[in-house]
C-alpha cells in the first residue's frame, strides 16, 4: 500500500506484479521443473513412454509404432519394443500420440500471439502506451512469457526471437533458465534496428536515423545480453506501398555494413528482414548472416549465399491462420 500522493515507479510496479505472480505460481513452477522449495533438484525420475508413434528426427525417418522410450532424468537412455521389460521405470501411456524431438522455431516475435489482426492498427503508438508505465509494462511482460510457454506446449523446445519489446526477450530467456517460468530455450535479439518509416520501426525495432544511432542501439542490445542482432533492411507485406510487392529497400547499404562489422567484432550474428531480391543482395553483400523471409533467387543471389555462408529462414507460418481457416476458401479469399 502506497501513501496518498505517492506514485509507484515503473520498477516498483514491475517488481510488485512479478512478486504477486510468483507467489501464486511458485508451487506449480517448482513442481513442473522438478525442484524443491529450496531450489534443489528433486530425485530424478525414470520414465518409460509407451503406446506412441515415434518420429526419431533423422533425415530418413518414418513413423514407427510399438516402441517405448526410456528416459532417466533428462536423458533418453534407450528406445525399445513396447513389450520390453522396464522395471524401475514409471510407465507413461501416450495414448497413440506422436513422440518426437523438440521443434526449433527460428523466427519468433514474442510481442504477438500469431493471430491475424482484425483491422489495421498503429503498433508504434500501442507500444508507446504499453511501455509508458510500470503496470502495463509488467502485464505486457507476462503476456510475452505466456506466448513463450505456448511455444513449449506446442512441442517447440528452442526459439529464436527476431524483434521484441524493450528487453523482454532476454528477460524471458533468463527467467526460463532460472526455472521461474516455463518456456523453451531462447536465443534473443530484443528490439531490432530499423530506420524512420522502416519495417516495425517504433514497435519491435528502433528507428535509427544514421549509422551512429544504429551502432548506439547495437551497444544497448549488447548490454542487455542479446544472442543475435536483427536488422530491418526492407519493408514487409503489411507495409508495402503497392499490394503484392513487399520488400522496398529502406536501410542504406552503408548502415547494414556498419552494424554487421561491429556486431561481428563483438561476436554477434546478424539476421535481417528482407523481402525482395534487391534487399537480399544488399544484405548478403554487406555481411548479414541470415536472411529472414527471403525472396526469389537468381544465380548471383545463390553465389552470394555461398560466399557469405549465410542461410535463409523461410517463414510460412504467418499464412497458416488464413490457410487453415474455414472462412477462407478459393471462392472467398480476396483477390484485390
Question: Predicted regions span which residues?
Answer:
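Conserved small/polar residues in nucleotide/adenosyl-binding loops
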Residues: 329-335
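N-terminal metal-binding scaffold of metallo-dependent hydrolase/deaminase domains
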Residues: 1, 21-25, 39-86, 97-100
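Metal-associated gating/positioning segment near the N- to mid-region
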Residues: 98-175
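Divalent metal-coordination and catalytic microenvironments
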Residues: 52, 69, 74, 96, ...
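Histidine/acidic residue-rich metal-binding segments in metalloenzymes
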Residues: 171, 212-312, 326
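Active-site mouth loops of central-metabolism enzymes
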Residues: 129-142, 199-213
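Histidine-centered divalent metal-coordination motifs
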Residues: 107-111, 273, 293, 330
Amino acid at each position: 500500500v502506497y501513501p496518498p500522493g505517492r506514485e509507484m515507479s515503473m520498477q516498483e510496479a514491475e517488481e510488485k506484479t512479478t512478486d504477486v505472480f510468483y507467489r501464486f505460481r511458485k508451487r506449480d513452477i517448482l513442481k513442473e521443473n522438478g525442484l524443491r522449495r529450496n531450489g534443489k533438484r528433486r530425485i530424478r525420475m525414470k520414465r518409460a513412454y509407451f503406446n506412441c508413434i515415434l518420429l526419431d528426427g533423422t533425415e530418413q525417418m518414418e513413423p514407427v509404432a510399438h516402441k517405448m522410450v526410456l528416459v532417466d532424468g533428462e536423458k533418453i537412455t534407450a528406445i525399445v519394443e513396447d513389450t520390453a521389460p522396464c522395471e524401475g521405470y514409471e510407465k507413461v501411456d501416450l495414448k497413440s500420440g506422436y513422440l518426437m524431438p523438440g521443434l526449433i522455431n527460428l523466427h519468433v516475435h514474442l510481442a504477438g500471439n500469431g493471430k491475424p489482426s482484425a483491422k489495421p492498427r498503429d503498433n508504434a503508438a500501442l507500444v508507446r502506451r504499453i511501455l509508458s508505465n510500470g503496470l502495463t509494462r509488467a502485464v505486457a511482460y507476462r503476456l510475452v512469457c505466456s506466448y513463450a510457454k505456448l511455444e513449449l506446449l506446442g512441442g517447440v523446445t528452442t526459439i529464436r526471437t527476431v524483434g521484441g519489446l524493450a528487453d523482454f526477450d532476454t528477460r524471458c530467456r533468463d527467467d526460463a533458465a532460472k526455472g521461474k517460468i516455463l518456456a523453451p530455450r531462447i536465443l534473443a535479439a530484443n528490439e531490432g534496428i530499423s530506420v524512420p518509416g522502416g519495417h516495425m520501426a517504433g514497435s519491435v525495432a528502433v528507428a535509427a536515423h544514421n549509422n551512429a544511432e544504429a551502432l548506439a542501439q547495437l551497444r544497448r542490445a549488447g548490454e542487455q545480453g542479446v544472442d543475435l542482432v536483427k536488422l530491418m533492411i526492407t519493408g514487409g507485406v503489411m507495409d508495402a506501398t503497392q499490394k503484392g510487392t513487399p520488400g522496398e529497400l529502406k536501410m542504406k547499404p552503408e548502415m547494414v555494413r556498419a552494424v554487421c562489422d561491429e556486431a561481428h567484432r563483438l561476436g554477434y550474428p546478424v539476421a535481417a528482414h528482407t523481402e525482395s531480391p534487391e534487399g537480399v543482395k544488399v544484405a548478403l553483400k554487406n555481411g548479414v548472416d541470415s536472411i529472414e523471409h527471403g525472396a526469389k533467387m537468381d544465380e548471383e543471389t545463390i553465389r552470394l549465399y555461398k560466399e557469405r555462408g549465410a542461410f535463409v529462414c523461410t517463414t510460412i507460418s504467418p499464412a497458416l491462420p488464413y490457410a487453415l481457416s474455414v472462412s477462407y476458401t478459393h471462392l472467398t479469399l480476396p483477390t484485390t
